[in-house]
A protein has these predicted regions:
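Flexible linker/loop signature enriched in Pro/Ser/Thr and Pro/Gly
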Residues: 88-125
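Loop-centered beta-sheet repeat module
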Residues: 30-92
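Bulky hydrophobic/aromatic content
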Residues: 1-52
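Polybasic (Lys/Arg-rich)
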Residues: 122-220
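Well-ordered beta-strand positions in beta-sheet-rich domains
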Residues: 64-66, 93-96, 144, 174-176
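Short beta-strand-initiation
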Residues: 24, 60-62, 66-68, 140, ...
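A structural signal for short hydrophobic beta-strand segments in well-ordered beta-sheet cores
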Residues: 72, 102, 165-166
Length: 220
């Protein structure tokens, strides 16, 4: 049954989840994607009591999400929904295991080609996954890193062989890649100081400020 309802998951998971909520959500989303329909759901998050709670608005009412689903993806053992949140003109990613009370709507979904950053092209999932290695939702950009050469394999594993190398020395090399900005930022934070963002300047400046704040937080 799972296989018949998972044609929109990429890549297919090696280990299958035993979470009944996830199975149910996948089946509903698969059906909605096939029918090109919007869905409505509620979304849960952890609180300090270590239990899941539905996200709420400021007035205390439960927040409802109306989205157009395009694809599901597995990243680091977690299932993600790639979709368009109806209020906006871009892509959002949601954890499938945190979706609650999902239902398919009669309204037709928003075609991917009409979204900002789509280039009026159908969704290329391989490219999307390369650009969104941490499944963040933000604008894509051409990012240039300076890395230690020991990181080359990690860079290719993470971003694929579409990266460009330049300015190579015995110890360092520059890397240029078209990638999701938040993913680039997280990558640089994870591997600092072995990875340094060179361009774009706004991202370099933001990372420098964030790392400075992190350093100050550890000062006595």
């Amino acid at each position: 049954y799972f296989k018949s309802c998972s044609q929109y998951i990429y890549p297919l998971p090696v280990e299958r989840t035993d979470n009944k909520q996830v199975f149910y959500n996948i089946a509903i989303l698969d059906d909605a994607i096939r029918k090109k329909k919007k869905v409505l759901f509620e979304y849960a998050e952890y609180h300090t009591d270590k239990k899941m709670h539905l996200k709420k608005r400021e007035d205390g009412s439960v927040r409802e999400y109306i989205i157009t689903p395009y694809q599901m993806a597995v990243q680091e053992g977690k299932y993600y929904l790639i979709c368009n949140y109806d209020k906006y003109d871009d892509i959002s990613n949601y954890r499938v295991d945190r979706i609650r009370n999902i239902q398919i709507l009669e309204e037709k979904g928003k075609p991917f080609e009409t979204l900002k950053w789509s280039g009026h092209q159908p969704m290329n999932l391989n490219e999307y996954m390369k650009e969104h290695v941490y499944m963040y939702s933000s604008e894509n950009a051409f990012v240039k890193f300076r890395i230690v050469k020991a990181m080359i394999s990690d860079v290719i594993d993470l971003f694929g062989k579409g990266v460009n190398f330049s300015e190579e020395t015995d110890t360092h090399v520059s890397v240029s890649v078209h990638v999701n900005e938040r993913a680039a930022e997280q990558f640089a934070k994870n591997y600092a100081p072995d990875v340094v963002i060179l361009q774009p300047k706004r991202l370099r400046d933001k990372l420098r400020d964030d790392l400075k704040k992190a350093w100050e937080a550890y000062e006595d």
